[in-house]
């Protein structure tokens, strides 16, 4: 389930720590820091400045955590609400009902309720961006489809697995806020960092001043401690509390300052944290193996690389079939069950006898190196390279797909599809494969690439017969073997193995004519065809075995004579 905002349970541990430290330092400042400056004027100024900074931090933190940074397209489909109302948590659909089934009635207490809703609305309303309308018009032309959210999102959105939704203008997921930082709350996030930075500076500065006065003006500090805190507190415990709170503020100030200046450089370069991380990973990590290299180096059998399905050569009809790694049809799933059970120690290369082979299979794959925020590396990074790396990462994402891929989820860049199925509206297509590959057209004689739809026009039938006649003229002499496609057996059959089926003979011509006939003509001719009984006999003898092509006696004799001469 997608998270609406950072206040939604469960709360992150870092979020609880951040809230606890904020209230701890605030209480420590008003109780142990400001009253011990030794001057009423300094005390009032310090309390006034600190109160403004602390209140700003509190409001901005509530705002950054409460804003929903999600892409406006992911909740429109789920709630059936308008886009401008989907971001408002107070909007209730017309058909909404209460728990008891009755109509939902909103109760309020008049002016107080209206003021409360106004304050909450001001806290959770998204940031105003001058370039929002221009970016929306550009992103609508290049929208993406999120397969996890099942919705169309904008071009620069990214799916956050921690929040379970796509974030508009994703920058990063902040664990201290328990919320994502995106286009809708990025300005508030930068203001929160600035306010927190100066708030911690004020805390640290006043804490150092009070700690120094504990040793410089001991009598005055002891008098103030007794006056403000009572007799139960002495100077050493007071100094210890001041040191702890001052050190805590310093430990929070250093990483926060680094993060603040890091985002200042990001704004200067015009990139996001996500683009920075992707660019550094592209520089440090080695490039992944391409799909072609995986196919070449794979030594384990699979349906795409087995010797039966990856048949590629020159047919005996003299027609060259050129394709890369494409199987003629999808084979049985005989290797898929064992494809994941690969023993890693059987890979090429020697294995030392002192190493247990079974322990090698238990090794975990290497994890990605965590990219740390570094303003110095960011200053040296080229913004154009970072944008290109982010665009490449979005293009290779398996979650965010182009909108066109939603209409055809099995569409790939290759012309060969591994998921081919017969068309529902064409009965004759069930006996042929609708597989296409480079260099293959309908003019080829191979019946695998020639479909004979039932509603084919007479002109197309005549053209196909002419193609068959033209192919016959290019056939070799009758003493060589010829092969025809048996649609019922699902394989090629040699005509030279059957008496009277030489090319040019009555049975051979009948076989070639049978290939170009439609479904009804094919079944009618097959009843009177002497080859039908032979095909059925071969299939009964073959059983469930895969087809095997055996050389004829003439081919074997010619091959032996060529080797010895």
Swiss-Prot record:
Entry GO terms, CC: plasma membrane
Gene this chain is encoded by: PAT21
Signal peptide range in chain numbering: none
PANTHER family: PROTEIN S-ACYLTRANSFERASE 21, ZINC FINGER DHHC DOMAIN CONTAINING PROTEIN
Domain DHHC intervals: 144-194
Principal cellular location given in the protein's record: membrane
GO terms classed as biological process: double-strand break repair involved in meiotic recombination; protein palmitoylation
GO molecular function per UniProt: protein-cysteine S-palmitoyltransferase activity; S-acyltransferase activity
Source species of the chain: Arabidopsis thaliana (Mouse-ear cress)
Superkingdom of this protein's organism: Eukaryota
TM region positions: 16-36, 42-62, 192-212, 247-267
Record flagged with keyword Zinc: no
Annotated function: S-acyltransferase involved in protein lipid modification.
Protein name (Swiss-Prot/TrEMBL): Protein S-acyltransferase 21
Family: Belongs to the DHHC palmitoyltransferase family.
Entry text on domains: The DHHC domain is required for palmitoyltransferase activity.
Keyword annotations of the record: Acyltransferase, Cell membrane, Lipoprotein, Membrane, Palmitate, Transferase, Transmembrane, Transmembrane helix
Region described as Disordered: spans on this chain: 348-375, 393-468
Keyword Repressor among UniProt keywords: no
Subcellular location: Cell membrane
Its EC number(s): 2.3.1.225
Catalytic activity: L-cysteinyl-[protein] + hexadecanoyl-CoA = S-hexadecanoyl-L-cysteinyl-[protein] + CoA
Biased composition (Polar residues): 359-372, 404-420
Catalytic residues identified in the record: 174
Membrane topology: Multi-pass membrane protein
């Amino acid at each position: 389930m997608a998270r609406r905002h950072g206040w939604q349970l469960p709360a992150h541990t870092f979020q609880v720590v951040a809230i606890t430290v904020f209230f701890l330092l605030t209480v420590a400042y008003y109780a142990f820091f400001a009253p011990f400056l030794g001057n009423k004027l300094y005390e009032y100024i310090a309390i006034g400045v600190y109160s403004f900074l602390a209140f700003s931090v509190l409001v901005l933190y509530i705002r950054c955590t409460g804003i929903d940074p999600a892409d406006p397209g992911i909740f429109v489909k789920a709630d059936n609400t308008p886009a401008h109302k989907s971001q408002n948590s107070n909007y209730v659909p017309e058909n909404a009902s209460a728990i008891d089934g009755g109509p939902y009635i909103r109760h309020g207490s008049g002016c107080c309720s209206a003021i409360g809703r106004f304050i909450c609305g001001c806290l959770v309303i998204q940031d105003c961006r001058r370039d929002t309308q221009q970016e929306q018009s550009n992103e609508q032309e290049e929208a993406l489809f999120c397969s996890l959210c099942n919705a169309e999102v904008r071009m620069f959105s990214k799916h956050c697995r921690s929040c379970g939704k796509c974030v508009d203008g994703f920058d990063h997921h902040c664990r201290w806020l328990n919320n994502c930082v995106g286009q809708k709350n990025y300005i508030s996030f930068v203001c929160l960092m600035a306010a927190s930075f100066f708030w911690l500076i004020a805390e640290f500065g006043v804490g150092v001043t009070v700690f120094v006065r504990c040793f410089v003006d001991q009598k005055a500090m002891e008098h103030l401690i007794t006056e403000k805190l009572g007799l139960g507190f002495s100077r050493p415990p007071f100094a210890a509390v001041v040191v702890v709170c001052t050190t805590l503020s310093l430990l929070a100030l250093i990483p926060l300052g680094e993060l603040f200046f890091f985002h200042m450089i990001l704004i200067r370069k015009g990139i996001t944290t996500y683009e920075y991380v992707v660019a550094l990973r592209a520089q440090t990590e080695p490039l992944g193996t391409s799909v072609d290299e995986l196919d070449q180096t794979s030594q384990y059998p699979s349906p795409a690389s087995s010797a039966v399905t990856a048949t590629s050569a020159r047919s005996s009809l003299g027609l060259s079939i050129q394709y890369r790694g494409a199987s003629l049809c999808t084979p049985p799933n005989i290797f898929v069950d064992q494809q994941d059970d690969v023993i890693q120690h059987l890979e090429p290369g020697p294995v030392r006898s002192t190493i247990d082979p079974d322990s090698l299979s238990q090794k975990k794959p290497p994890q990605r190196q965590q990219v740390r925020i570094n303003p110095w590396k960011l200053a040296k990074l080229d913004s154009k390279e970072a944008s290109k790396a982010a665009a490449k990462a979005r293009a290779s994402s398996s979650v965010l797909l182009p909108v066109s891929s939603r209409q055809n989820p099995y569409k790939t860049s290759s012309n060969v599809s591994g998921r081919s199925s017969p068309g529902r509206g064409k009965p004759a297509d069930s006996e042929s494969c609708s597989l296409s590959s480079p260099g293959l057209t309908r003019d080829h004689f191979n019946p695998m690439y020639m479909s004979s739809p039932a509603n084919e026009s007479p002109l197309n039938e005549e053209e196909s017969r002419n193609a068959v006649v033209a192919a016959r003229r290019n056939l070799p002499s009758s003493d060589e073997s010829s092969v025809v496609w048996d649609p019922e057996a699902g394989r090629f059959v040699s005509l030279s193995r059957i008496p009277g089926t030489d090319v040019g003979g009555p049975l051979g011509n009948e076989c070639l004519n049978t290939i170009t006939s439609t479904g009804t003509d094919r079944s009618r001719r097959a009843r009177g065809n002497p080859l039908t009984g032979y095909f059925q006999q071969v299939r009964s003898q073959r059983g469930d075995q895969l087809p095997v092509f055996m050389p004829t006696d003439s081919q074997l004799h010619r091959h032996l004579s060529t080797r010895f001469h």
